């Protein structure tokens, strides 16, 4: 990922293909790599000219970035600023593949195709919301990757928050991409920043037995393979409704569920 010579060779190869075929091809760079490699890849793609289409009239070049995006808020913001300097916003796709799963897409269909639910899909009708993603399997051969990440960054700050935003979002004015993203973003902005005392009182983390003996895992690792967080939303629709986020590996069963407790 670090050597820019490889990017130059790739640019030359793609240019030869376009010339040979007499076309200006579309180019999509999909990054599903550990977060420490993003910076070098972004820079090398830009400096080698791979981010520029071969013609202003036809062909496009885009970059897709997968989770995890940075190690924390600071590094994620730094990477996003770098993306903005090296690429046009129209070229950038920040992807969470979990949104493509049928279970996730069914949340939207269930919520907004049943008009009778709308009046009670709020704090008046729902007493509690739980977002749970449990996996029966352990980390498998992902030790080197997972041990530097943990459950919260692997699935909590992306998959579970996407499920939460879909479950709690208000009805969009239109069912297009921009409108859906706008309503999901409102939910995420309503999440409070937990203090150290909040974390002690309302969060749990754990590690399954035998994790430290997994391949490529540090024997003294404190990386969590399980977490549970209770939080809430600071908005009028869901004010006062407890929200539970939970995920873990090597659990008794595999399941993805968004149970809600209806007020009686």
Set out the residue ranges of the language-model regions.
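Secretory/organelle targeting and membrane-embedding segments
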Residues: 1-65, 69-264
């Amino acid at each position: 990922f670090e050597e820019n010579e490889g990017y130059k060779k790739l640019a030359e190869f793609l240019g030869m293909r376009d010339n040979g075929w007499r076309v200006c091809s579309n180019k999509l760079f999909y990054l599903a790599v550990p977060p420490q490699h993003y910076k070098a890849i972004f820079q090398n793609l830009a400096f080698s000219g791979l981010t520029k289409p071969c013609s202003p009239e036809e062909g496009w070049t885009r970059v897709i970035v997968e989770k995890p995006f940075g190690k924390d808020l600071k590094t994620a913001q730094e990477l996003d600023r770098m993306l903005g300097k090296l690429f046009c916003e129209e070229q950038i796709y920040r992807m969470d593949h979990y949104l493509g799963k049928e279970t996730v897409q069914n949340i939207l269909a269930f919520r907004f195709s049943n008009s009778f639910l709308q009046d009670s899909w709020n704090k008046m009708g729902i007493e509690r919301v739980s977002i749970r993603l449990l996996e029966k399997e352990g980390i498998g051969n992902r030790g080197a990757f997972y041990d530097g990440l943990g459950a919260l960054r692997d699935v909590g700050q992306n998959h579970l928050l996407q499920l939460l935003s879909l479950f709690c979002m208000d009805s969009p004015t239109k069912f297009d991409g921009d409108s859906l993203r706008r309503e999901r973003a409102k939910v995420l902005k309503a999440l409070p920043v937990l203090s150290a005392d909040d974390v002690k009182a309302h969060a749990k983390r754990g590690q399954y037995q035998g994790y430290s003996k997994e391949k490529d895992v540090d024997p003294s690792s404190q990386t969590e393979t399980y977490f549970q967080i209770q939080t809430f939303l600071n908005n009028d629709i869901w004010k006062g409704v407890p929200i539970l986020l939970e995920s873990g590996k090597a659990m008794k069963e595999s399941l993805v569920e968004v149970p809600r407790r209806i007020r009686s």
